[in-house]
A protein has these predicted regions:
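Active-site lid/adjacent beta-loop-alpha segment flanking the redox-cofactor pocket in flavoenzymes
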Residues: 260-371
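Dinucleotide-binding Rossmann-like beta1-alpha1 core, especially the glycine-rich loop
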Residues: 53-140, 293-295, 299-305
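Helical element adjacent to the flavin cofactor pocket in flavoenzyme catalytic cores
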Residues: 157-212, 216, 220, 224, ...
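Flavin-dependent oxidoreductases
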Residues: 19, 199-201, 210-307
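N-terminal Rossmann-like FAD-binding beta1-loop-alpha1 element of flavoenzymes
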Residues: 6-34
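Glycine-rich FAD pyrophosphate-binding loop
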Residues: 25-49
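C-terminal catalytic lobe of FAD-dependent flavoproteins
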Residues: 320-434
Length: 444
């Protein structure tokens, strides 16, 4: 078979890889790009709408973000909104809505009020909602099953309307690739059902071996999938553990918008939240749970189990970090409780108790386990720092190849990350990147 050579090959057709294909085609001088995807379509894993909360994480209601991180995330979140507006995707897969972070009890109420004062300059649209205001805009947060006001004091910070809050990242990934293909004078080939087995560098070229026996090579490679860095002997200082998130759905619409709980600083997992679901007619989806699984891909059988153990890269440093983070009684109890959420019948009983912190009146018969919903989020461990690294990770130590790991808010940050990687590729290849055009079209 004749070898097909590209300037850049991107491995992984989720939101991160698809965004990079678009940015390279639209804004760089690179003319020859390929995107390789293991499965039959784009965004079939963590980027599809059923695998995540469909939230634009811009930092306004994410209480685990400090002001510095919120500022950076907001800049990247604005890019995806601008992209959608440019192409007319409003109310197709980008939607406005109500959202808020809820504080329950005296200490959380004070934290929300303090946070509001710190963040209102960065997010001028933010409002503070007391219990009386919440009765009008999100009454299920206030009243219990008897129709009486909940005993705890509550307050929320958020916005009622006029802000984009919700997106179908799977649909967005498909739009990125289609728009990349439409750029005149550029080649953007999409190879589906193309599982990458090995990446080898010979001289200045990278050779890609695939399960379907394509003969591919590239001058520059970006890997947005799998455990390929360890296969190449790179990134040995990093390991990953995989946390799966499941959801419960309500049988009717209970919330008017997104409601996020306060994040426990001890827990490296998302706090419980309720979201009107795009796939379920606006019925509320509660989650995610947190379940450790020995696989990189959920709902795909056991084929990713070997890759999990490669990416775990287990040694005593990893053991110490796991013990430090999961040996704490509060964290351990949290994980045990989340295992319980996966058990039929019992899981619903346990989960309802948690969900009542958001909706005091919710009952077991109001919810059901959302089969097939949820994904897997890699959590990165640094051997040298001996700690869990929250957020995204990038391995770029070897010239000509980049490996990305993009847990939340990776989907929200997809264009910002694509900009970074596109500039790296252009610099390495000696090709121009049109910063002025990108700023004009993608920055607000």
């Amino acid at each position: 078979m004749q070898e097909k050579h590209y300037e850049v090959i991107i491995i992984g057709g989720g939101i991160t890889g698809s965004a990079l294909a678009y940015v390279l085609a639209e804004f760089s001088g690179i003319k020859n790009i390929a995107l390789l995807e293991k499965y039959e379509g784009l965004a079939t894993l963590n980027s599809k709408a059923s695998a995540n909360s469909q939230t634009i994480h811009c930092g306004d209601i994410e209480t685990n973000y400090d002001l510095q991180k919120a500022t950076e995330v907001k800049r990247k979140a604005d890019m995806i909104v601008k992209y959608c507006q440019k192409h007319g995707y409003e109310n197709k897969f980008l939607f406005q809505g109500q959202k808020m972070a809820l504080g329950v009890g005296e200490s959380e109420v004070e934290l929300i009020k303090e946070r509001f004062e710190k963040f209102k300059e960065l997010y001028p649209y933010l409002q503070l909602f007391d219990k009386e205001e919440l009765k009008k805009i999100e009454p299920k947060l206030v009243f219990d099953g008897r129709g009486e006001e909940r005993a705890e004091d509550i307050v929320a910070m958020g916005v009622q309307s006029g802000v984009y809050t919700t997106i179908d990242y799977g649909a967005m990934a498909n739009s990125f690739v289609q728009n990349a293909k439409n750029v005149e004078g550029k080649t953007c080939d999409l190879h589906l059902n193309t599982e990458v087995q090995n990446i080898t560098k010979v001289g200045d070229k990278f050779y890609i071996r695939t399960a379907n026996r394509l003969s591919l090579s590239a001058d520059f490679v970006v890997v947005d999938a799998g455990a390929h860095s360890h296969k190449m002997g790179l990134g040995q200082d990093l390991s990953t553990i995989c946390i799966a998130g499941s959801f419960y759905l309500t049988k009717q619409k209970l919330l008017n918008g997104k409601v996020y709980m306060m994040q426990n600083p001890k827990l490296p997992f998302a706090a419980l939240h309720g979201d009107p679901d795009l796939l379920a007619g606006g019925c509320t989806r509660f989650g995610p749970t947190a379940l450790t699984l020995p696989k990189l891909e959920r709902y795909k059988g056991c084929r990713s189990v070997p890759e999990f153990f490669q990416s775990l890269n287990f040694d005593m440093d990893v053991a110490k970090v796991i013990w430090q983070n999961f040996g704490d009684s509060e964290v351990r109890d949290f994980l045990i409780r989340n295992i319980g959420f996966e058990i039929p019948i019992l899981g619903k009983k346990l989960f309802v108790k948690n969900a009542r912190k958001i909706i005091p009146s919710i009952r077991e018969e109001d919810i059901y386990y959302a089969k097939g919903f949820g994904g897997v989020r890699p959590q990165v461990i640094s051997h040298s720092q001996k700690k869990l690294l929250l957020g995204e990770a990038r391995i770029g130590e070897n010239p000509g190849i980049i490996f990305n790991m993009t847990p939340s808010p990776g989907a929200t940050s997809c264009l910002g990350n694509a900009l970074r990687d596109a500039k790296s590729a252009c610099e390495y290849l000696g090709v121009s990147f049109d910063d002025a055009k990108f700023d004009a079209e993608m920055m607000r």
